């Protein structure tokens, strides 16, 4: 396994998320993980995507994450535009319920059958379609209770905004809150401009053969999309399924 020396505290560097991760183990493919240390003003550990998203009328957002502490609301994915500070937002509250905001519409809040365990990797997928406003959240391959229709129905998510991982933006690229930050680890975050079916999502959530488990995002692809790291975020090898 190759060693990666991540960004130091207070620096910003470009991360190419799979420069050194090309081999595989029998028990699970080696991939990259990003560690977010605790936030405290003025330090807000985060990844900021280089570039923006296109207009979107359907999405699937999937990722693996591990929580170190669950004392308050944890923000995983925040996409803001000049017109809307919650164009797309996903988070986990301390009671264990997942939230998804789309285009500032009333948020989807669901309680999932699989409890989130501190220090354990979990796989999460969010889907949304503008056509009927159908939104779902699933954890570890299982649908959560409370999936709904009528969420931002007929809406198009606008291009031109900023994607931030690990912090919630209250303005584009700013106004972060330490009480809404991720303290933990994140891996294999991918975004598609379509809704994946249940079987595809189940494959992504399992420690299966890489050809079955990995369906790479066509909007954000973890091993190719470029990010900047701030305030002590560290990239290292990771074996999710080991």
Swiss-Prot record:
Cofactor note: Binds 2 calcium ions per subunit.
Signal peptide as annotated in the record: 1-24
UniProt key word Calcium: yes
Keywords, alphabetical: Calcium, Disulfide bond, Glycoprotein, Metal-binding, Secreted, Signal
UniProt-annotated binding residues for Ca(2+) 2: 168, 170, 180
Cellular compartment(s): Secreted
Reported cofactor(s): Ca(2+)
Disulfide bond annotation, renumbered to this chain: 62-125, 112-144, 207-241
PANTHER family the UniProt entry points to: LAMININ G DOMAIN-CONTAINING PROTEIN, PENTRAXIN
Protein name as it appears in the record: C-reactive protein 1.4
High-level lineage: Eukaryota, Metazoa, Ecdysozoa, Arthropoda, Chelicerata
């Amino acid at each position: 396994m190759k060693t990666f020396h991540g960004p130091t505290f207070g620096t910003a560097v470009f991360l190419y998320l799979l420069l050194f991760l090309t081999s595989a183990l029998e028990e699970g493919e080696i991939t990259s993980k990003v560690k977010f240390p605790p936030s405290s003003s003025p330090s807000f550990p985060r990844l900021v995507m280089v570039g923006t998203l296109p207009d979107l009328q359907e999405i699937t957002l999937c990722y693996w994450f591990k929580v170190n502490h669950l004392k308050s609301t944890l923000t995983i994915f925040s996409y803001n535009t000049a017109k809307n500070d919650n164009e797309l937002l996903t988070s986990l509250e301390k009671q264990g319920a997942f939230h998804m905001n789309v285009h500032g519409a009333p948020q989807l809040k669901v309680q999932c059958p699989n409890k989130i365990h501190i220090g354990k990797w979990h796989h999460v997928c969010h889907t949304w379609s503008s056509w009927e406003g159908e939104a779902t959240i699933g954890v570890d391959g299982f649908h959560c209770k409370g999936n709904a229709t009528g969420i931002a129905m007929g809406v198009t998510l606008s291009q031109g905004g900023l994607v931030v991982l690990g912090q919630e933006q209250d303005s584009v690229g700013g106004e972060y809150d330490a009480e809404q930050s991720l303290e933990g680890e994140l891996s294999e975050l991918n975004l598609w401009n379509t809704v994946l079916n249940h079987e595809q999502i189940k494959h992504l959530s399992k420690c299966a053969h890489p050809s079955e488990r990995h369906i790479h995002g066509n909007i954000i692809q973890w091993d190719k999309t470029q990010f900047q790291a701030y305030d002590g975020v560290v990239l290292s090898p990771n074996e999710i399924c080991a």
